[in-house]
């Protein structure tokens, strides 16, 4: 298996490729401002200036927000550590006197992730036994290059040798908006015969003594650690390929955002199912509001 870091260095950055493709498409359209009447153009110029002032304030807000989040992330640290110790059985809670063989909270992270709709789609039945060995998931911000990093901690297991699997997201600022530049995942060192992402099939050939081998790719949660790769030749990336790669990266980033913003900070609620009920309630509340709006519209009509 190739080293993801080497691949990312040798290949063009996907975000640049997509930007070039989109730029080419944008040039085909008429400039909206040039098509406006002079008096309307003056008004729009003022609106653009207002928007510019707004964007400056928003940039300051995002900067202060990032600093505040970083500060509270440090405060959360001891709580996450204690949570991890209880889940893994390193720390027993006060008041427990009965000796039991079962330590900690079995299948804690697996059950929590399966209760989330986005992550449940990524977890296949063949993944579950391996994910039972998952002890903890942590994330942290990185500054050089800018982005964030996940660490998945596993007990010793029969599937792979790694004790820690990592996934790092490198971000760039584009018009004050963070955009994914690339993602780098750990190369998983699978134990022979236990790889969950692919299998090498061997078939005897009747025409020669050399057997024919074929690699069968499997859907698996552990593909999360093998981000989408960019073709070596940018010229071969047509519009459809660029769109497909963009969709893959967006899906990958959705998974990362779910882990970072929902699962890690509120994993207990996802384990118990409380978070699922909260999300369902929120969706119902939005649907009810939309129904009310439709009723008002019907009455007005």
UniProtKB/Swiss-Prot annotation:
GO terms for molecular function: chromatin binding; histone binding. Residues 15-69 form a coiled coil. Keywords: Chaperone, Coiled coil, Cytoplasm, Nucleus. Pfam families: NAP. It is found in: Nucleus; Cytoplasm. Residues 278-301 are annotated as: Disordered. A motif (Nuclear export signal) lies at residues 36-51. GO terms for cellular component: chromatin; cytoplasm; nucleus. Its main location: nucleus. GO terms for biological process: double-strand break repair via homologous recombination; nucleosome assembly. Gene3D superfamilies: 1.20.5.1500, Nucleosome assembly protein. May modulate chromatin structure by regulation of nucleosome assembly/disassembly. PANTHER family: TESTIS-SPECIFIC Y-ENCODED PROTEIN. The acidic domain is probably involved in the interaction with histones. Belongs to the nucleosome assembly protein (NAP) family. This is Nucleosome assembly protein 1;3. It comes from Oryza sativa subsp. japonica. The gene is NAP1;3.
């Amino acid at each position: 298996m190739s080293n993801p870091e080497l691949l990312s260095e040798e290949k063009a950055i996907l975000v640049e490729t997509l930007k070039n493709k989109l730029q080419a498409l944008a040039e085909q359209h008429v400039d909206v401002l040039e098509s406006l009447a002079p008096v309307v153009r003056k008004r729009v110029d003022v609106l653009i200036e207002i928007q510019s002032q707004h964007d400056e304030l928003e940039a300051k807000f995002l900067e202060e927000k990032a600093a505040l989040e970083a500060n509270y992330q440090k405060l959360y640290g001891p709580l996450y550590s204690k949570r991890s110790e209880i889940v893994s059985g390193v720390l027993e809670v006060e008041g427990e006197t009965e000796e039991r063989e079962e330590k900690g909270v079995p299948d804690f992270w697996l059950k929590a992730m399966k209760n989330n709709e986005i992550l449940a789609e990524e977890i296949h039945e063949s993944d579950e036994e391996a994910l039972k060995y998952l002890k903890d998931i942590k994330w942290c911000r990185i500054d050089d290059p800018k982005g964030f990093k996940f660490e998945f901690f596993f007990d010793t297991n029969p599937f792979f040798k790694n004790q820690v699997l990592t996934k790092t997201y490198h971000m760039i600022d584009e018009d004050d908006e963070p955009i994914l530049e690339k993602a780098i995942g750990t190369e998983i060192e699978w134990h022979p015969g236990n790889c969950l992402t692919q299998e090498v099939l061997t078939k005897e050939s009747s025409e020669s003594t050399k057997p024919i081998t074929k690699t069968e790719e499997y859907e698996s949660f552990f593909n999360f650690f093998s981000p989408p790769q960019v073709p070596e030749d940018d010229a071969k990336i047509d519009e459809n390929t660029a769109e497909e790669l963009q969709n893959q990266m967006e899906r990958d980033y959705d998974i990362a955002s779910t882990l970072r913003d929902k699962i890690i900070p509120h994993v207990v609620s996802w384990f118990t199912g409380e978070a699922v009920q909260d999300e369902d309630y929120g969706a119902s509340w939005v649907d009810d509001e939309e129904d009310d709006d439709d009723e008002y519209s019907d009455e007005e009509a």
